[in-house]
């Protein structure tokens, strides 16, 4: 069961640290280490800001196209599935992604980083910084969301 849990976690969370896995699973550090050791042949280590992150061989992280944009819903696993969110979210923008009461907002993922917020009603996007991604990529992300919503009605 431990091997399966570690495999599923690292397949769906990338990059992730040992601390992230411990926090998400609720298991002791020792058990999480054992699970990670048992799947070590499927994990690659990546250093990000001096911290050791692990990527499962099946994960798409790093394979996204340049200037890729994804509109993520509130409470997306990208934010709630990690103890330390610094790999995807700058400290200065944390309160734009979630508040101190645990309310998470819809966010824009741009090239592996949370780069803004978006509104479902108007399908409008606000970026945290002045630089904006390619307009065609943003339109593609909006169309993907619209297709998803229309498919699931």
Language model segments and positions:
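Long, charged, low-complexity, helical-prone intrinsically disordered regions
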Residues: 1-153
């Amino acid at each position: 069961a431990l091997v399966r849990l570690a495999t599923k976690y690292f397949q769906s969370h990338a990059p992730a640290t040992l601390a992230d896995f411990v926090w998400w699973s609720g298991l002791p550090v020792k058990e999480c280490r054992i699970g990670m050791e048992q799947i070590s042949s499927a994990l690659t280590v990546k250093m990000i800001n001096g911290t050791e992150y692990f990527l499962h061989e099946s994960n798409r992280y790093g394979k996204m196209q340049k200037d890729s944009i994804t509109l993520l819903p509130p409470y997306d696993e990208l934010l709630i599935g990690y103890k330390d969110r610094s790999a995807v979210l700058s400290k200065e923008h944390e309160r734009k992604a979630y508040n101190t009461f645990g309310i998470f907002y819809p966010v824009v993922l741009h090239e592996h980083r949370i780069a803004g917020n978006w509104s479902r009603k108007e399908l409008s996007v606000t970026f945290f910084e002045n630089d904006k991604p390619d307009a065609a990529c943003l339109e593609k992300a909006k169309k993907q969301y619209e297709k998803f919503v229309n498919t699931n009605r």
